[in-house]
């Protein structure tokens, strides 16, 4: 399925909702989508 990337392990996509980028500050965690090797950005922020 994939060769490398934060959402790829052993040439397979990681499962959907696997955390690929931990939250920092008011940002929320980013999760693998189970379809790509990239780590899609979560557009949401924690409420102020």
From Swiss-Prot:
Disulfide bond positions: 2-11, 7-32, 8-37, 20-39
Record PROSITE patterns: DISINTEGRIN_1 (PS00427), DISINTEGRIN_2 (PS50214)
Similarity comment text for this entry: Belongs to the venom metalloproteinase (M12B) family. P-II subfamily. P-IIa sub-subfamily.
Main localisation: secreted
This protein's record includes keyword Repeat: no
Tissues where the protein occurs: Expressed by the venom gland.
Alphabetical UniProt keywords: Cell adhesion impairing toxin, Disulfide bond, Hemostasis impairing toxin, Platelet aggregation inhibiting toxin, Secreted, Toxin
Subunit comment: Monomer (disintegrin).
Leftover remarks: The disintegrin belongs to the short disintegrin subfamily.
Function comment: Inhibits ADP-induced human platelet aggregation.
Gene3D superfamilies: Disintegrin domain
InterPro entries from the UniProt entry: Disintegrin_CS, Disintegrin_dom, Disintegrin_dom_sf
Places the protein is found: Secreted
GO cellular component: a single term: extracellular region
Top-level taxonomic group: Eukaryota
Domain Disintegrin positions: 1-47
Name of the featured protein: Disintegrin leucogastin-A
């Amino acid at each position: 399925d994939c060769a490398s990337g934060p959402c790829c392990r052993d040439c397979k996509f990681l499962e959907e909702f696997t955390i690929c980028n931990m939250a920092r500050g008011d940002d929320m965690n980013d999760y693998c989508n189970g379809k790509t090797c990239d780590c899609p950005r979560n557009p949401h922020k924690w409420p102020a």
